[in-house]
Structure formats: C-alpha cells, structure tokens
Regions:
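Phosphate/nucleotide-binding beta-alpha loop and adjacent structural elements of enzyme active sites
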Residues: 1-223
C-alpha cells in the first residue's frame, strides 16, 4: 500500500510541476482570467482548479471527481473556497451509477474502459450525470470555460445531446484519446461538429503519444 501511495505522490508532483512551473496550459490563461464560470472535469486531480483560482480569484469553479478517496482529498484541500463547487460524480452520456476501472497508482488514468493507460485496475461504483442534467439542475445558462479529461469517455459526452450543450460553452479544452479505428471514425464526426460550433479550433499534439491530443476551441460570441 505504501508503494502505491508513494507512486501517487510522485505522479501528483509531476502534474504540479507541469501546471505551476512549466505553465503547460498558459495558452488558456486569458480565457480563464476572464471567465465567470469554469467546469473542471477531472484533469490533474484538483490542481487545475487551483491554477484557475490562482489566475482568477472571483470565478466560480465546478469541480467533478467521481472516485471517493480522490474526492475526499480534493475536499480537504479546497474546502475553504466557497466558490469551488465540489461534485462527487462524473460527466457522462447518461445519468446513473456505473463501474469505473480505477488505476490506483495514477487515478487520473481511470476510466469506464481498460487500455494501456490503466492495465491494472480495481472496479469501483461511481455516480455519473449528463452535462445537460447538471446545467438544468443548477440553473446554469452558460459555461465560460470547460476543461475535460475523462479518458476516452469524451466521445460519449461530445456526441450526446451536443446540440443543447454546444450552445452553452464559450471555451473548450478536451483531451482526446484515439484508441482504435472506431474511435478515429467517431472523432471525425465529432470534430466536424466542434468546427461548426466554435470560431477557432486548434489541435495541440501530445509529446508522449500521437493518439492522445488536446482540442482547444473558442467562440467569439454567443449564439
């Protein structure tokens, strides 16, 4: 168990270095600084939310973490920030309870699906909600900045009810995982929808694997 915790800490330190020292996401700085509503859907544990708060001390941040232990760690870190809304569930194509394959060493690489990112996993039951249900339930009219890294479940979210959700998002970052040919085909359709929604769309390639990359999309004005 201590070995797992040591590896978790090592990975968290590496993520912290990427965000706060290397500023790998500085391309989004101005959008975050001007955002009133930010969605942080499981990317770099709670570190990205902290970076957003560092850049913008007034914005309201909605943070999503489905795994109980990780949620409790985020809660103990962010509890005193009343403008960070902590949600112990994930965004998906359907609301309900589902099994996540938890990568205990690198919890950020857990998913509903198994791949090289989580070759050794533990099954845990987690809650999920659709983005549309969350927006309606919390009376949110728009999202200024949405960041999503949900280990190739992004295909479900970006495909489901997109006609409703795309009109709510001003800026979008999502990590895309092309794990097989089927996903490549689906991605072509999703990418077309994104290009038809946002004025400026960029692909930011990963320095680690060519099948994983970021989509960075922005609109000029609301529809």
């Amino acid at each position: 168990m201590n070995n797992i915790k040591d590896k978790q800490l090592k990975y968290e330190k590496a993520l912290e270095y990427e965000i706060f020292t290397k500023w790998e996401y500085s391309f989004a700085k101005s959008k975050i600084q001007n955002a009133n509503c930010i969605f942080d859907i499981w990317w770099h544990i709670w570190l990205f939310s902290q970076w957003c708060r560092f850049l913008n001390d007034k914005t309201r941040i909605h943070y999503f973490e489905p795994v109980g232990d990780s949620y409790n760690k985020a809660k103990s870190t962010l509890w005193n920030d009343k403008n960070i809304i902590l949600n112990n569930y994930w965004i998906a194509s359907k609301s309900g309870k589902w099994i996540i394959l938890l990568n205990q060493e690198k919890t950020m690489q857990s998913s509903k699906y198994s791949s090289f990112l989580n070759p050794i996993w533990k099954e845990i039951e987690c809650r999920f909600i659709t983005l549309q249900d969350y927006l309606i339930g919390n009376d949110i009219d728009k999202i200024d900045f949405l960041k999503m890294d949900i280990e190739w479940m992004e295909f479900e979210v970006l495909s489901s009810r997109w006609d409703f959700e795309r009109k709510k998002i001003n800026s979008l970052i999502s990590e895309i995982h092309l794990m097989n040919e089927k996903m490549e085909s689906e991605w072509n359709q999703i990418f077309l929808k994104i290009k038809n929604t946002f004025w400026n769309v960029e692909i930011i390639n990963s320095k680690y694997r060519e099948e994983i990359f970021l989509i960075w999309a922005n609109r000029v004005s609301w529809l």
